């Protein structure tokens, strides 16, 4: 997949074939986003065109779209896995002032678009003035087909990244995973911690959520961790470590991987979240903390048995 980081003509290998372009922010690549992208890929396959995605970049911390569910690298990998060949992702500042007409003409011109695909809640142009109905009106005289994909549903309500964030905040991992269409996962660098887990005989990997990422509820989760091509059952504690830390504002993510030993510092293993296990709490003794970690690990092994 070729990534183009500005609103500019795509370097199409066969310009005469044109493209089918999926449009949206696609922040979580949830089941609704995937339906839009897969529709563009399918149209391109049926009409001998190149499948493309048009989206835009926001600063890591922003108030416009909420906290991030995916890193940029993971987002690119997921979209590429769906069969997309071209990925156009200018900065939002570059396109925010375009009228709906300018926006559509720019995409049709730069992508040599034969079809534009969007969700039924898609907006475009300055102040989000455009909608799918206007998109059809603008594309008709250009001979460009418009495909509007119905919003995906979960529990009889539309799937959205906002709903996924809310599910994560509540610790409802099954709901978040159902809407994502895959396990919620993190892939952050393993950093040195205080070494308490090693002292207790339950060494953990420590990962910090970068600023701007959505945090799940602080508690203990059943997870699995991908290391060296192998998935290991694991237990992950997310929170302020109340037993040993008086600073309730410092959130850490610690994962115990029973049966694994090795140096993971500086690597970025994938940790998938599968189920809520128990609330985060302060223990009276370190022995109680050790017992809790071992019990969580046992539950994780049973879960994946």
Task: List where the protein language model places each region.
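Short acidic-hydrophobic, aromatic-tinged amphipathic segments that line or gate anion-handling sites
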Residues: 2-11, 88-89
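A short acidic, often aromatic-flanked loop/helix-cap motif at beta-alpha or helix-coil junctions
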Residues: 9-13, 94-97, 153-157
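N-terminal catalytic cores of NTP/NDP-binding nucleotidyl/phosphoryl-transfer enzymes
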Residues: 11-66, 71
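Short beta-strands and strand-loop turn motifs
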Residues: 22-24, 54-55, 87-91, 115-120, ...
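Residue-level signal for inorganic ion chemistry
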Residues: 30, 79, 116, 176, ...
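N-terminal Rossmann-like or analogous alpha/beta NTP/dinucleotide-binding catalytic cores
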Residues: 60-142
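Glycine-rich, Lys/Arg-enriched anion-binding loops that position phosphate/diphosphate groups
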Residues: 139-239
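Phosphate/ribose-recognition catalytic cores of enzymes acting on nucleotide-derived substrates
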Residues: 193-305
